[in-house]
Amino acid sequence: MRTATRARRHPGRGSTRTIAAIAAVGLVTACGSGGSGETSGETGAGGPDGVDDGTTLTMWTRAATQAQSEALVAAYNESHENQIELTVIPTDDYQAKVGAAAGSGELPDLFASDVVFVPNYTSSGLFTDLTDRIESLPYADALAPAHIDAGTFEGSKYVVPHTLDLSVLFYNKDLYAKAGLDPEQPPTTLAEWDQHARAIDALGDDVHGTFFGGNCGGCGVFTWWPSIWAAGEDVMNDDGTEANLASDVAQQVYDVYRGWAADDVTAPGARDETGTTWTGYFPEGNIGVMPMPSTTFGLMPDDLDFGVAPIPGPDGGESTFVGGDAIGISAASEHVDQAWNFLAWSLGDEAQIDVVAANGDVVARTDLASNKHSDADPRLVTVNELLASGRTPYSLNFGQTFNDPNGPWLTLMRDAVYGDETKLEENNEAVSSSLSS
């Protein structure tokens, strides 16, 4: 069964809290909550498709999603009068760059963002209100629900999906067969995943059951939280100010990972893995089953026989962390109708099928999960279908809490798997304090 995404309402926040949250992620902005984008939600003079009149548009994206952004921009520029000048900014510098540009009024017409940081921008008025434009699209209800939800602030929609990266279970079919497991039956519960990993690890030599980034907070939220969501639980409250990471279900998840660490079911290096190399182990063919980003699908060797599956919960269910980038029109743009022309085109059948799906990437629409490109490989359909049931967590203090190597989430992770597991409640309170600060 699939665990459905639940719609959430993100209550308004005072300007003091908004400014504090922006500072926490390295932004400096002079915009107040709502900004000039509040009154720009109407469809516009160009109709639902916007205006294509030869305008030059500026667009920013981070290096992590450079390939996908360049492919979309190249296809758009080739087929439209409007032309987009794309600037790719180093990922580690991106938030500071956006913040500085917001403060000086120099944001581009379009800018993408890691979807977990979108709430910081929407609550600070950096994006134009696109509510009416989005809802006028014939496939509006099929747009990646988690991205739309993350970009909704005080009832208005500010962004659309740009690039998608989902957490997915990868498993080695050859190792499954050698361990006496059915290569066509991936685990459907966390308990089965544990059993499969241990059976493969027992093969010995250089073969290992699984792997994970044990010193990587971002890896943890991306691959551990889906097991909690799959059980129908939340990891935070709706407005992202209180953690629920000490629940019985969460404890069950941590216990499995703790068992893998204690019994050396993981490949060497998991304890110290900071995320820089954690996806490089599985392609070598010596790992049985592990969760990874969907974007690694196309990087697998041609001779590696592997399958993909949803990340399961302790007793069943399935979910995924819907990451990647969302994109919107800056509140300072003087070319809203032209910028919308690009966004609307990027979500249409032509771009989603002939650019996104053709490159083996996850499509931004649930109604296109099965298409002429994904149908050639059922594994891609499996990944695409997860979009409908996945989640993107919402919190203004996400970065400082979960991505910062000195943040409280990594401490909770490390204690739960390698340290003093009795500190779980205490560590959960520390996460809540960071979220609400």
Regions found by a protein language model. Name each.
Residues 158-162, 167, 191-243, 287:
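Extracytoplasmic/periplasmic solute-binding protein
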Residues 2, 177, 183, 389-437:
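Conserved C-terminal helix/tail region of periplasmic/extracytoplasmic solute-binding proteins
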Residues 196-201, 239-270:
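Glycine-centered hinge/linker elements that transmit conformational signals in sensory
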Residues 115-166, 220-223, 307-309, 373-378, ...:
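Hinge/lid segment of periplasmic solute-binding proteins
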Residues 223-226, 254-335:
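Extracytoplasmic/periplasmic substrate-binding proteins
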Residues 357-407:
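Long, aromatic- and glycine/proline-rich binding clefts that accommodate carbohydrate-like moieties
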Residues 2-24, 31-120, 135, 183, ...:
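Conserved N-terminal structural module of periplasmic/extracytoplasmic solute-binding proteins
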Residues 101, 108-109, 137-176, 317-318, ...:
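A structural signal for short loop-to-beta-strand junctions that line the ligand-binding cleft
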